[in-house]
């Protein structure tokens, strides 16, 4: 079940393998998902979700979804993180310019003391001849 882009307070990130053991086959789960698909041969596809985590564990963070054609995984991942950080920064009263370099943004985070960090999950692929390709990236909530 796709949900909003809010990272609930107190959420912890856990690796995929132990998380999968917590979800029985066929279970309905909550997620924030990005998906991109095409059947155009040679087309570069990418899907990414980015997370921005606040320093205050009682506060909520943000999760962004981003999908594109022609971007590398690194470009899409950085963009997804920037989107999530910009959403969180706006709610915390931090002036955040997505066009600044990562080093400048990291310094803003450090000085503000309000954002712990960002991360992303990204998948990319090139469409093969005579086929259809879908890339998917998701944050899945385990309760």
Predicted feature locations:
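Helix-coil modules at protein/domain termini and other flexible surface or pore-lining loops
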Residues: 1-143
């Amino acid at each position: 079940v796709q949900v909003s882009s809010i990272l609930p307070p107190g959420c912890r990130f856990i690796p995929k393998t132990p998380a999968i053991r917590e979800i029985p086959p066929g279970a309905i789960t909550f997620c924030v998902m990005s998906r991109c698909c095409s059947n155009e041969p040679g087309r570069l596809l990418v899907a990414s979700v980015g997370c921005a985590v606040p320093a205050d564990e009682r506060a909520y963070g943000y999760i962004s979804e981003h999908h594109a054609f022609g971007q590398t995984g690194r470009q899409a991942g950085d963009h997804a993180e920037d989107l999530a950080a910009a959403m969180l920064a706006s709610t915390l009263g931090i002036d955040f310019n997505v066009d600044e370099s990562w080093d400048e943004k990291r310094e803003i985070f450090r000085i503000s003391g309000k954002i712990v960090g960002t991360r992303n999950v990204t998948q990319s692929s090139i469409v093969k001849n005579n086929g259809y390709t879908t890339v998917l990236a998701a944050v899945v909530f385990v309760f």
